[in-house]
Design a protein with these regions (language model features):
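Short, amphipathic alpha-helical segments that act as regulatory/interfacial helices
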Residues: 38, 42, 85-92, 140-151, ...
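Basic, Lys/Arg- and aromatic-enriched nucleic-acid-binding interface segment
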Residues: 10, 121-133, 137-142, 152, ...
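Well-ordered beta-strand positions in beta-sheet-rich domains
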Residues: 24-27, 176, 230, 241-245
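Short beta-strand motif preference
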Residues: 12-17, 231-233, 244-246
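N-terminal DNA-binding module of tyrosine recombinases/phage integrases
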Residues: 6-110, 114, 265-267
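C-terminal catalytic core of tyrosine-transesterase DNA break-rejoin enzymes
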Residues: 134, 152, 204, 208-215, ...
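Catalytic-site neighborhood detector that most strongly recognizes the C-terminal catalytic loop/helix
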Residues: 178, 235-239, 323, 330-355
Length: 360
């Protein structure tokens, strides 16, 4: 039987001692609440459903997320780490003051709906700015994995993962942003005028090769084989290493970058390097601020850097490369992922059918 005792401060403490379970207790303001808790907890023990929730009730989400970043995110690929940190900051801003046990499926569902509706994200005029479904989906994926790790590895007593019980937004259709000839000319003119030539090399290499920004900026000199005109990528988004062939333009750009007289050879082997950090180490060149400035000047605020990869792959298809050849260059893991480019194949077929008609 549970023991209910009155404490010197006037509250009521329920203590449960049961064979096969650790002694557990909880303090309440009212005796009735202590009795109700003791009765339901003992019932859970009898039915084999008892979960000790004390840690889940004490651990704040902000502390849990900090621990996740230290113990879990740190072991993920740099590309993933880069994406998770801002998502973690967003989740902490919303759930940070909650205990893990206080985050329910209803609360997570409201977060999902508010993010999709742009409730907490306004433009200069105060109008809601809805987020893309895939952005919210990735935030929920991080939130859900934190709860999974907390339950399975940290021993946090939670009955269920609140994210598993809600609907996730679908990724939606992939972006289909292409550069017009006028846009490309305007963009490249501004890129070429920028003070740091590394921005020019990075942007033009992206258009020529279809490489991701993280793949380009993390390159080391020994990964660039200009004699064979290839770049060897060891760490990619889909974990599969690949060798990227270089066009003549891409080779010339890499030659300039590798021969950069400002690159401190003794300090870094990075092709695209930033200023030394507080620890004296040089990390990959962070061009995000410069890229945003250039886009604004060019009047192309809707252009994402990743759209340059889409542009490059589209050009590969238009040039007549097979899906297998395109996949080898771009690193798309399956042919299914290249289906968004099938309309380009269809346009080629129309031209071929026209030529066939002219010949008959």
């Amino acid at each position: 039987m549970p023991t209910i005792v009155k404490t010197p401060s006037g509250t009521w403490k329920a203590v449960i001692r049961k064979t096969g379970f650790p002694t557990t207790s909880k303090t309440f303001r009212l005796k009735r609440d202590a009795e109700d808790w003791a009765r339901s907890t003992e019932d859970e023990m009898v039915r084999g459903m008892y979960v000790k929730r004390s840690q889940a009730e004490k651990m704040l989400f902000s502390d849990a997320m900090d621990r996740y970043l230290r113990e879990v995110t740190i072991h993920k690929r740099p590309y993933t780490q880069q994406g998770e940190k801002p998502r973690a900051a967003t989740l902490k801003a919303h759930f940070g003051a909650y205990a893990l046990a206080g985050i329910t499926s209803e609360l997570v569902a409201k977060y999902r709906d508010d993010r999709l509706a742009g409730v907490h994200r306004k433009d200069a005029k105060g109008n809601p700015q809805p987020l893309q479904p895939n952005t919210v989906r990735l935030e929920l994926a991080l939130l859900g994995h934190l709860f999974t790790v907390a339950i399975k590895e940290w021993g946090v007593g939670l009955v269920y993962n609140p994210v598993l019980n809600i609907r996730r937004p679908s990724p939606g259709a992939g972006r289909n942003r292409r550069l017009s000839a006028q846009e490309e000319q305007r963009l490249m003119q501004l890129i070429d005028q920028y003070s740091n030539p590394m921005l020019r090399w990075i942007v033009r290499i992206a258009v020529e090769t279809g490489m991701r920004s993280s793949e380009i900026t993390s390159l080391k000199v020994d990964q660039v084989d200009l004699a064979r005109r290839v770049v060897m990528l060891k760490h990619t988004k889909n974990t599969m290493p690949r060798t990227v062939p270089l066009s003549l333009k891409a080779s010339a750009l890499f030659q300039e970058a590798v021969d950069n007289p400002l690159r401190p050879k003794r300090e870094t082997h990075l092709v695209f390097f930033g200023e030394p950090g507080k620890d004296g180490k040089r990390r990959p060149y962070n061009f995000n601020k410069a890229w945003l400035e250039i886009k604004a000047k060019a009047g192309m605020s809707d252009l994402h850097f990743h759209d340059l990869r889409h542009e490059a792959v589209s050009r590969f298809v238009e040039a007549g490369l097979s899906d297998q050849e395109v996949s080898t260059i771009s690193g798309h893991k399956s042919m299914q992922m290249l289906k968004r480019y099938t309309h380009l194949r269809a346009e080629d077929l129309v031209a071929k059918l026209d030529r066939l008609s002219d010949a008959t």
